[in-house]
Every structure is written in C-alpha cells, then in structure tokens.
Amino acid sequence: MLQGIRILAMAVTGLCAVNLLYSQSNETKQNSADLLRTFKTIYVQSKTPLAKPQILAGELQKNASFDAWGLSITSNPGADVVVEIDHQPGWFYYTYAMTHQSSSIVLAVGRVNAWDGKQASARIAREIMKRVARVRNPPTQH
C-alpha cells in the first residue's frame, strides 16, 4: 500500500513538473516577427562619434509610420529595443543592429555605405522602418 502511494506521488509530481515546463516554454517562445509587431520604445546608441544617436532618432521619427505605430524614442537604456550604430574606421560603411532587450533577440542587422554619419543615419532609419513594416503592414493577399 505504501509503495503504491509513493508511486502515485511520484507520478503526480512528474506530471506537475512537465506541466510547469510546458507552460513556461509557451510563455517564453517569441519570434522576431511578434517582437517587431509589438515593441514601442527605442533607445539609440552609437559606438562612433561620426554618427550621433540623436541624428538616427530624428531620421526614424521622420517616417510617417513612426507615429502611426505608436513608437517612441527614449533616453532610457531599458527601452523595448536598442539600436546600435558602429563605423569601421577607414571604410565608408556603417553597421547597425536592433536588439530586443528582454529576449536578446536580434530583430534587424545590416550595413549601409555612406560618406558620413548623417547620411548613414538616414539610410539605417529607412532599413529599420522597412524591416518593421514587413510585419506591421504585411502585403495583402488577393
């Protein structure tokens, strides 16, 4: 009798553990499309003095969809996403990466060719907004 109770208790404990693991994995399963659809705040940082964060922030805000999607630039490094700009000295290209903070999922990454940080910021802003538009304004099916 005692052996049967122990087996039953172990079975119940095992089922509870499996249920807990399953519920946690469903909650944490996020993909880049879901994150691109739902983020609201953006923090911009630059690893180069050639491209100021304020210039990229301004270029992002120029896009008509920026306000329509309810996006905001913040000076808080704890924003939903961080956009980081860098420049390779001696070359005319700038790299960027947009990362979702809480999940560490990279949402966009790329490189643009530009003579200076202002031109690079404009091109990076266009690339980022195109990436977001693919999930927020999907093409209609006919």
Protein language model regions, located:
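Solvent-exposed beta-strand motifs enriched in subsets of small alpha/beta binding domains
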Residues: 45-46, 84
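Short acidic low-complexity segments
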Residues: 67-79
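Short, structurally constrained coil/turn elements
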Residues: 17, 65-67
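C-terminal/domain-edge helix-coil "capping" segments
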Residues: 24-42, 48-65, 99-142
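Bacterial N-terminal signal peptides
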Residues: 9-19
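Short secondary-structure boundary/capping segments within folded domains
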Residues: 34, 72-75, 88
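Mid-chain, structured segments of secreted extracytoplasmic proteins
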Residues: 77-112
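Bacterial N-terminal signal peptides that target proteins for export
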Residues: 1-11
